[in-house]
């Protein structure tokens, strides 16, 4: 018994050690499980991933989309663009080749934006400071990149050059941010507008905060006008900023008192387009088609009217504007419609404005119809006041295309995903119906300008023109045809733009469908997005790849219904069917080439005889199929024999396999047997 106690104690001690080991193991397991459940993170993972993608982009590795900006090409990845830009997301879904509006984004600005998308860092702008930063801000708003928009606004606020527009003052939706000669950004108006003798305006629709800034003139250290505008007595540089004269399509419209009478606004020379018979001018930018990087001429040059885009002037309730008009202004009034302006200045200020315009030394130029805006029921549709003029070097093809879209004030943000894009002007639309209406309006606007110009100077520069040019002075801009009157010319030119509204931006060739134009542009850029998985060969079209894959699979889906021949490509079958063209008597003919062997040729030739004779000839053929190439003609001949001799295809093949050898002296063109 005494000896058993130590054993029992040892056993108890042994169990206690096992228990302790088990407890330690359980604790270690719990700690391991706890460590596994804890979240782990590599802080630099996302940055390293973007850096790798950016390296791939610079090398063109796995890039699946090309962005064309003017003459510059940028390769990128669709996933990255779609995750960064709502506008680009709607485009990369459908196309591998994107054309951005060069009036909205310049190649240099887009390079900065693309670097920001891949790195999250905005590089140093070119010399110009806030001017370039303003262009980046406008382009980022156009491309709908909220992170870059916020970064640009933050930088501008730090420098004190940015003021945010507050909603509720005017019944307008903001247009696009536009840049003037000097990049100082000021508020459109500060404080509460002075009361005027007008009816109160209903609350406005929410303003678009992405474009809530004005790129105004350099007036450092000078307080703003009570309405946020340059007073008439200050000859400041043109505030080519946001076009606030465009009414919201769904918002309330301003109304005047019943005693007020609408007056035609005095035509402003800076907002007029350049013509071939007037000196080129440069000034404000088109609100519906803004250019965030196009400079305006410095100072008070013609085309840089300080209030060319001022939407806040009120028309004084007087009978006629107190301005004498010369021949140039009479010509302008033939082109322009009456335009009631916004109720934001009183009569005295409006009169000062008119007097200042009278003293302005700017050459008259032919105006251009502006954007129609939605007014109240008792007002006729009027036009806004901001538009783009040509550069000092004369109108370019891009400027001509800009004039096509002057009838619409388009805001991409209000239309969501714009999947239908007008190629000439770059505007996007949510439906094909709106795009078709827009393209038709393109043509009407173009013809309106052409017809009006021809009416103004019908025989300009004719000099020693012949009698035909005098009798038909209206010439088509797309072809050499000329007509007696502009109405006939208008009907003719519709055949150019309405049937082929999509021109190639590289060579100018026009197409009826946007997809056809995109595929055509791939030939210029060498794009072959469709690759064969078996051999790696690449193609520009999907159907070409499908045809190529049949080489690997051996599939021949196209069968000749006359002789039973099979082909991998449809065009080969079409070419083959030409051999079976009907003869003078209407019977189908079989024209076999020299590569078809003697048995097939001779047998088919003799099938033009009676049925018994054909069967006899087939039974005498033998040992002709020793050449493997002759097997290619076995199935067509068997099918042909079965159809005309009443045999099954298996039986016909058996007879042909046992046929004796015959010589190959037979005609190539024979008539198929037709039962009596």
Curated annotation (Swiss-Prot):
Region entry Binding to CtBP, spans: 241-245
Family: Belongs to the krueppel C2H2-type zinc-finger protein family. Hic subfamily.
GO biological process terms, semicolon-separated: intrinsic apoptotic signaling pathway in response to DNA damage; negative regulation of Wnt signaling pathway; positive regulation of DNA damage response, signal transduction by p53 class mediator; regulation of transcription by RNA polymerase II
Chief site of localization: nucleus
GO cellular component, as recorded: chromatin; nucleus
Chain spans, region Disordered: 1-27, 264-326, 342-405
Biased composition (Low complexity): 384-398
Zinc finger region(s), C2H2-type: 420-447, 474-501, 502-529, 530-557, 558-585
Record-level Gene Ontology MF annotations: DNA-binding transcription factor activity, RNA polymerase II-specific; DNA-binding transcription repressor activity, RNA polymerase II-specific; histone deacetylase binding; sequence-specific double-stranded DNA binding; zinc ion binding
SUPFAM superfamilies reported in the protein's UniProt record: beta-beta-alpha zinc fingers (SSF57667), POZ domain (SSF54695)
CDD domains with a match to the protein in the record: BTB_POZ_ZBTB29_HIC1
Role according to the record: Binds specifically to the gamma F-1-binding motif of the gamma F-crystallin promoter. May have a regulatory role in sclerotome specification and/or differentiation. Isoform 2 functions as a transcriptional repressor in lens cells.
Expression tissues: Isoform 1 is highly expressed in kidney and lung. Expression of isoform 2 is higher in the lens, retina and stomach, and extremely low in heart, muscle, kidney and lung. Isoform 3 is weakly expressed in heart, kidney and lens.
Domain BTB, chain residue ranges per copy: 63-126
Biased segments, Basic and acidic residues type: 8-23, 266-278, 351-361
Oligomer status and interactors: Interacts with CtBP.
Domain of life of the native organism: Eukaryota
UniProt-recorded name of the protein: Hypermethylated in cancer 1 protein
Key words, A-Z: Developmental protein, DNA-binding, Metal-binding, Nucleus, Repeat, Repressor, Transcription, Transcription regulation, Zinc, Zinc-finger
PANTHER family referenced in this protein's UniProt entry, alphabetically: HYPERMETHYLATED IN CANCER 1 PROTEIN, ZINC FINGER PROTEIN
Subcellular location(s) of the protein: Nucleus
């Amino acid at each position: 018994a005494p000896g058993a106690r130590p054993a029992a104690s040892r056993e108890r001690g042994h169990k206690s050690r096992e228990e302790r080991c088990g407890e330690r193991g359980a604790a270690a397991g719990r700690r391991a499980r706890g460590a596994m459940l804890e979240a782990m993170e590599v802080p630099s993972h996302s940055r390293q991933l973007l850096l790798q993608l950016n390296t791939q982009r610079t090398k063109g590795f796995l890039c699946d989309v090309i962005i064309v900006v003017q003459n510059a090409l940028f390769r990128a990845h669709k996933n990255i663009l779609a995750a960064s830009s709502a506008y680009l997301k709607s485009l990369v879904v459908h196309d591998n080749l994107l054309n951005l509006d060069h009036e909205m984004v310049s190649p240099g600005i887009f390079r900065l934006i693309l670097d920001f998308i891949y790195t999250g860092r905005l590089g140093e702008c070119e010399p110009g400071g806030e001017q370039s930063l303003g262009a980046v801000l406008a382009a980022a708003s156009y491309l709908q990149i909220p992170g870059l928009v916020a970064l640009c606004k933050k930088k501008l606020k730090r420098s004190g050059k940015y003021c945010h527009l507050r909603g509720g003052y005017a019944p307008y939706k903001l247009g696009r941010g536009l840049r003037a000669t000097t990049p100082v950004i000021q508020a459109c108006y500060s404080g509460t507008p002075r009361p005027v003798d007008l009816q109160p305006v209903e609350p406005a629709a929410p303003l678009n905060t992405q474009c809530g800034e004005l790129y105004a003139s350099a007036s450092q250290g000078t307080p703003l006008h009570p309405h946020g505008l340059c007073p008439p007595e200050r000859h400041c540089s043109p505030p080519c900023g946001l076009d606030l004269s465009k009414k919201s399509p769904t918002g309330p419209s301003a109304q005047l008192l019943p005693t007020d009478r609408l007056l035609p606004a005095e035509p402003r020379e800076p907002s007029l387009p350049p013509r071939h018979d007037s000196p080129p001018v440069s000034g404000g930018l088109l609100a519906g088609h803004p250019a965030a990087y196009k400079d305006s001429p410095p100072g008070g040059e013609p085309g840089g009217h300080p209030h060319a885009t001022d939407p806040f002037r009120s028309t004084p309730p007087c009978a006629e504007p107190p301005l004498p008009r010369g021949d140039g202004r009479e010509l302008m009034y033939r082109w322009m419609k009456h335009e009631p302006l916004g109720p934001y200045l009183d009569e005295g200020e409006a009169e000062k404005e008119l007097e200042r315009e009278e003293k302005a030394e700017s050459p008259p130029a032919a105006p251009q119809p502006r954007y129609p805006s939605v007014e109240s029921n008792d007002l006729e549709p009027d036009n806004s006041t901001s538009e783009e003029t040509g550069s000092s070097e004369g109108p370019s093809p891009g400027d001509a295309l800009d004039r096509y879209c002057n009838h619409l004030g388009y805001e991409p943000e209000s239309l969501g995903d714009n999947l239908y894009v007008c190629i000439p002007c770059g505007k996007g639309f949510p439906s094909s119906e709106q795009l078709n209406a827009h393209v038709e309006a393109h043509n009407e606007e173009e013809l309106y300008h052409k017809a009006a110009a021809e009416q103004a100077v019908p025989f300009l520069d004719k000099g020693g023109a012949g009698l035909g040019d005098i009798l038909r002075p209206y010439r088509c801009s797309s072809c050499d045809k000329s007509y007696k009157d502009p109405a006939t010319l208008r009907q003719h030119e519709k055949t150019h733009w309405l049937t082929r509204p999509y021109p190639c931006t590289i060579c100018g060739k026009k197409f009826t469908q946007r997809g056809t134009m995109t595929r055509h542009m791939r030939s210029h850029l060498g794009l072959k997005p469709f690759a064969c998985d078996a051999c790696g060969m690449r193609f520009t079209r999907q159907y070409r790849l499908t045809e190529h894959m049949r080489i690997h699979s051996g599939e021949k889906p196209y069968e000749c219904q006359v002789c039973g021949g099979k082909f991998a490509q449809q065009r080969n079958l079409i070419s083959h069917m030409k051999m079976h063209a009907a003869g003078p008597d209407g019977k189908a003919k079989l024209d076999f080439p020299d590569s078809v062997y003697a048995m097939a040729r001779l047998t088919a030739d003799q099938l033009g005889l009676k049925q018994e004779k054909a069967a006899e000839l087939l039974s005498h053929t033998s040992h002709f199929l020793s050449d493997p190439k002759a097997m290619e003609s076995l199935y067509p001949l068997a099918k042909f024999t079965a159809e005309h001799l009443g045999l099954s295809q298996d039986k016909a093949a058996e007879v042909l396999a046992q046929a004796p050898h015959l010589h190959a002296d037979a005609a190539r063109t024979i008539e198929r047997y037709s039962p009596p």
